[in-house]
């Protein structure tokens, strides 16, 4: 097996070979590079973390995993002046970059299969791109998982592989969203074991069997262990006991779906002197009025300031927000990986030309779908892809008469169907997405707004979830960065009805916008929505969609508080 690149023909290659022959120099070089690269992944690019760190605030970030939040909270209480979050993120980035660089240099200097080197580069590129597409995922978590996967490809001992597994799980605990990433990690390592066995053409796995079995045990136990840790964090941490507790903090509650909105809210909070918390743990706003009544803060909505008390509210548990957690179906994938790996270990593996393409397509499936799929109905075609890949990968399985080309073609067909079908339908119309009457009528509104490409400020009330509304808006080319789910805001301030009557506005769902603006603009006299949008958000809003139980009204703003009806049903 040749190295991916002719290293000795250039200065850079000679330098890498020199480092690979002297471990001490290699470690010094990697540590220096890791230190230099850390600012590129610092919290300066993350407005929420930067705000929490540099403002001296040590209250828990609600977007983080409860277990990690509990650790940060406990350490912060012990050392109030220590920037715990910054130090922890810096440490994670330092170790992750070190592991990534070491993996790449090992691939360049050693005679490793080119497919493993390509896999390493693809892993790094994917997590970098995914962090760009999904900025709510903290970069340190993505780096930790990518480095664990890449370093596993060059690990030769079970201790190193155990460390990679634990390091990956540590990255998962940084964010609550990362729990489901355990599933594709299992697939990644299963594919790597297949590559190693194909490369060495062994009848049995020998030294691979123990480390592989150990990894599977840890991975299978990871989901319930993380769930137990989450419950422990809820029970032990005063910040997560029965809901939300802002200890000596003043919180500006907002529902911006992305960090661009949060960045704007940070500017608002800086002007009002409020701390900002991303309110993404509530299913919807139906519990917010109850929370306000319990805290007796109806007239001071923008400054919920409760010292020593707990605000009772209903939180989304991980198994409710992420169907993969707490569900038995995802556990099938590690089990299937174990069975298929066992077959390959026991039987003689016959290397074929189609093995590498199968592995490549399997990686594409894992990357594109396993980490992003929340709908359980998609598990069936994904499982079929796994089976087809396994058939074409191992010619000694019972179904060896099926040509590898057919398996690859069917897998590509399934992938194309899942990728191109934005409605979530499965091939052949097995699963058909249905809309309620209200959602279908809202679709008419979206079609109308698509023909009028103004920047829209929309309330999605007819949709069951915000993600559903966001998907519809993207399909209709609306500005999703200016979409805010304001359902329930009109319940905050009953006294605002006087201003509605004075402006001859009868639609309560139009009132919620002005209430929403007045709520954020604490201390500002005028409730006008237009100056606020232009000044704070930079949005020159031309239309407002008010959707209530299937009925809609589209208003055009003429002046600060004058609205003209454009269209209604």
Language model feature labels by segment:
Residues 34-52, 59-72, 80-83, 434-437:
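Extracytoplasmic catalytic/substrate-binding loops of multi-pass membrane glycan-assembly enzymes
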Residues 113-114, 161, 206-221, 396-425:
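Signature aromatic-anchored transmembrane alpha helix within multi-pass, membrane-resident enzymes
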Residues 14-17, 96-102, 313-350:
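Hydrophobic, aromatic-rich transmembrane alpha-helices
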């Amino acid at each position: 097996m040749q190295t991916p690149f002719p290293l000795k023909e250039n200065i850079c290659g000679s330098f890498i070979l020199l480092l690979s022959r002297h471990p001490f120099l290699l470690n010094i070089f990697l540590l220096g590079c890791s230190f230099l690269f850390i600012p590129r992944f610092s919290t300066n690019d993350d407005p929420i973390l930067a705000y929490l760190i540099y403002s001296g605030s040590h209250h828990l970030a609600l977007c983080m995993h409860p277990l990690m939040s509990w650790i940060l909270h406990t350490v912060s209480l012990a050392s109030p002046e220590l920037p715990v979050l910054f130090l922890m993120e810096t440490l994670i980035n330092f170790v992750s970059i070190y592991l990534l660089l070491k993996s790449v240099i090992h691939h360049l200097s050693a005679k490793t299969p080119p497919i493993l080197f390509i896999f390493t580069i693809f892993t790094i590129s994917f997590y970098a791109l995914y962090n760009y597409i999904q900025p709510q995922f903290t970069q340190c978590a993505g780096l930790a998982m990518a480095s664990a996967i890449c370093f596993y490809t060059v690990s030769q001992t079970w201790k190193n592989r155990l460390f990679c597994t634990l390091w990956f799980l540590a990255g998962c605990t940084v964010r609550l969203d990362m729990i489901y990433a355990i599933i594709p990690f299992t697939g990644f390592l299963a594919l790597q074991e297949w590559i190693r066995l194909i490369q060495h053409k062994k009848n049995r796995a020998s030294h691979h069997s123990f480390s592989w079995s150990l990894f599977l045990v840890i991975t299978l136990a990871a989901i319930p262990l993380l769930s137990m840790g989450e419950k422990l964090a809820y029970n032990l941490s005063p910040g997560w006991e029965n809901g939300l507790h802002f200890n000596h903090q003043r919180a500006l509650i907002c529902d911006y779906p992305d960090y661009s909105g949060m960045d704007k809210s940070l500017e608002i909070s800086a002007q009002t002197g409020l701390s900002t918390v991303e309110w993404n743990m509530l299913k919807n706003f139906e519990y917010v009025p109850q929370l306000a009544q319990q805290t007796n803060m109806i007239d001071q909505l923008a400054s919920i300031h409760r010292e020593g008390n707990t605000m009772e509210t209903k939180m989304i548990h991980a198994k409710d927000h992420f169907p993969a957690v707490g569900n038995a179906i995802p556990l099938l994938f590690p089990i299937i990986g174990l069975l298929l790996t066992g077959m390959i270990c026991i039987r003689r593996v016959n290397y074929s030309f189609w093995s590498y393409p199968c592995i490549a397509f399997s990686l594409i499936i894992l990357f594109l779908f396993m980490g992003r799929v929340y709908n359980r109905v998609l598990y069936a075609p994904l499982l079929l892809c796994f089976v087809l890949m396994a058939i074409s990968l191992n010619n000694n399985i019972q179904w060896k008469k099926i040509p590898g080309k057919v398996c690859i073609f069917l897998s590509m067909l399934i992938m194309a169907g899942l990728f191109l079908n934005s409605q979530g339908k499965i091939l052949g119309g097995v699963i058909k997405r249905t809309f309620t009457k209200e959602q279908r009528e809202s679709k008419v509104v979206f079609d109308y707004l698509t023909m009028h490409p103004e920047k829209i400020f929309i309330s999605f009330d007819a949709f069951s979830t915000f993600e559903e509304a966001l998907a519809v808006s993207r399909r209709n080319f609306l500005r999703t960065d200016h979409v805010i789910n304001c359902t329930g805001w009109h319940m905050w301030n009953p006294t605002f009805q006087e201003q509605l009557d004075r402006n001859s506005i009868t639609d309560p769902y139009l009132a919620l916008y002005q209430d929403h603006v007045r709520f954020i603009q604490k201390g500002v006299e005028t409730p006008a929505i237009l100056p606020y949008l232009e000044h704070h958000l930079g949005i020159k809003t031309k239309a407002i969609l008010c959707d209530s139980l299937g009925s809609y009204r589209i208003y055009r703003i003429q002046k600060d508080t004058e609205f003209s009806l454009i269209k209604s049903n």
